[in-house]
Amino acid sequence: MMSTLALVSLAIFGIAVVCAAPKPATVPVANEEDYLAALYGFEAPGSQFKGAPLQSKRHISPSYDVEIDAGNMRNLLDIGKRSAPMASDYGNQFQMYNRLIDAGKKKRSPAISPAYQFENAFGLSEALERAGRR
């Protein structure tokens, strides 16, 4: 009886020691984009347009996020660390240009959008061409 009681108390003490032992911290799974961001100094930016104060929204257009993404894509291509196939990259660039043009067509930022500047330059060249013919 005494030996059984000693064994039970020893087992309870052993379980308590195991439960109280510090557990190793679980390491979060590293994302490849986070690794490249840390390695090369890139980071996935949040939308700076949405959180910006009203005065600076004139200088940060809705297409600003797209420009940042394009810069990061270009830098990663230059480094050669892209794992995406080339066709996927062209698809991403095509989407990016479409988003830039759509951002330029919005009413709230016509003066600073790339599409508006392109249309202005195109209209100016047409006007100069017409003036040169006269």
Swiss-Prot record:
UniProtKB keywords: Amidation, Cleavage on pair of basic residues, Neuropeptide, Signal
Signal sequence residues: 1-20
Name recorded for this polypeptide: Neuropeptide-like peptide 11
Residues where Alanine amide is found: A131
Gene Ontology biological process: neuropeptide signaling pathway
UniProt source species: Caenorhabditis elegans
Gene that produces this protein: nlp-11
Propeptide: 21-106
